[in-house]
Amino acid sequence: MARSLKKNPFVANHLLRKIKNLNIKKEKKIIVTWSRASVIVPAMIGHTIAVHNGREHLPIYVTDRMVDHKLGEFAPTLLFQGHARNDKKSRR
C-alpha cells in the first residue's frame, strides 16, 4: 500500500542535513549512509550517495529520474550466483 499523500516523504534527518550543507557550499562529495528507506528528493540530484547493502557501500549517482524512489531500490542486497547445476559426472 502506498504512503498517504497527506504525509511528507521520509528522508533521514542526518542525510537531509548533509545534502543541504553540500548544496550551500556547492560541493560534490560522496555521502555515506545506511538509510535505505529514505526517499530521493529533488535536492539530492547530482550528488553521489553510498548506500549500504549489508556488506559494503555502493555509490549511487542520483539523477532526476530517481526522484520519489527509495535509496534501497538501487543497492541490491542479494547476489544471485545461479541455480545449482546437475552434476551428472559425479553420479557415475
UniProtKB/Swiss-Prot annotation:
GO cellular component term of the entry, any: chloroplast
Record-annotated membrane-spanning stretches: none
Keyword Plastid: yes
Entries under InterPro entries matching the protein: Ribosomal_uS19, Ribosomal_uS19_bac-type, Ribosomal_uS19_CS, Ribosomal_uS19_SF
Record keywords: Chloroplast, Plastid, Ribonucleoprotein, Ribosomal protein, RNA-binding, rRNA-binding
Cystines in this chain: none
UniProt-annotated location(s): Plastid, Chloroplast
Gene Ontology biological process: ribosomal small subunit assembly; translation
Pfam families for the chain: Ribosomal_S19
Coiled-coil regions listed in the entry: none
GO molecular function, one term: structural constituent of ribosome
Family membership: Belongs to the universal ribosomal protein uS19 family.
PANTHER family per record: RIBOSOMAL PROTEIN S19P FAMILY MEMBER, SMALL RIBOSOMAL SUBUNIT PROTEIN US19M
Chain's role: Protein S19 forms a complex with S13 that binds strongly to the 16S ribosomal RNA.
NCBIfam families the record matches: rpsS_bact (TIGR01050)
The name this protein goes by in its record: Small ribosomal subunit protein uS19c
